[in-house]
Amino acid sequence: MNNASRRASASFLEGVRTRGVLLLMPSAKASLDDSAYWSWCLAAGFQEIGVPVFSNESSSFASRGITVAAAPEMIHDDTMVIGDISAIESCNSECVTLARRVFERARRSALLCMSDVVSSVDFPDTAPVFVAHSNSRIFARGRRIPWAFGLSREVMDKIAGAHRLQVRERLFLRNFRPSGNQSVRNALDLSFVKRLADKMAIDTSFDNHGRWNSDYFDRLGGSLGCLAYGGHFVEDFFRREEFRSQIGERRILSDEPAIDRWDSWRFWESLASGCVTVALDFDEYGLQIPVKPVNGVHYVGLRLDRLEDAVALLSGPQTPLAVIAENGREWVTTHYAPAPVAHLFLETMERLEESQ
């Protein structure tokens, strides 16, 4: 199937438009932070394609400029129910209760989880779970559907309103804030970034204004490229005999270290801003999303054993880089803007229903 045409059937879409989608999440206190990002993206996308949206926490959506109706007292059997448990680390008991509600309903229901720890969480097989950071080399139980951070309507509006230079500065942004469990960034600082800095200007400054501030999008709009990788290395402890009884089963399906927690907002924002986006090679490291970009066409993918190739490309002639940047911008807005993501979600749900 052509990825650009991944949409639910007309009859399925009409049914969802008739009964709507109920987005459930933990308390408003927990859902006002960015853990509700996927719910915001889906709500905006559903509304753009004519699907009514309800929620038990409408204040979370209002905080991002999205108006949704309050959850009805009675939920029709044909209403699609989506539970967002991305805040599982900060409100575990609420998320467990919410997940049980979805699993008990089973029909036309699903969970969302973009938590940093989702790759280590096992789920029942009752309902599908759309998960971030999916890696073919990391095993966890459940009906797991690889999903991507993607673009919110708010982010797209801020990118559209950002100041853009007619000629971008020939530099790369490396603006990661220090944080835990980012061993991939640390390793590449010691190897790739040092090599690239010998040939290209790199802006390593970062701000402390929080996520999605206008200054950041202005910087993206004026820069040639952005380093947008992330994640941490995990290895197979099951290979060590004394750990096997504690682990129970093999979780890392590779003799080499795998990469977890690899997705980031920066990757999507960089692509949509028209930057040359530098990330890990999706195919080389088993990174999974519904529609994958092509290395060298939509982004520049790093292989840790071939960093010199990436340095040569990024420090070379600007015309090929400009083509990659424009291809990446077109790819991300085609597949990962709110409306395409909403269509893709419904197509996936219909396909899962048909397979049962």
Model-derived features with residue positions:
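A charged, aromatic-enriched C-terminal amphipathic alpha-helix characteristic of glycosyltransferases
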Residues: 319-350
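Hydrophobic, well-ordered secondary-structure elements that form the walls
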Residues: 270, 299, 328
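Membrane-proximal bilayer-interacting regions
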Residues: 309, 315, 339-341
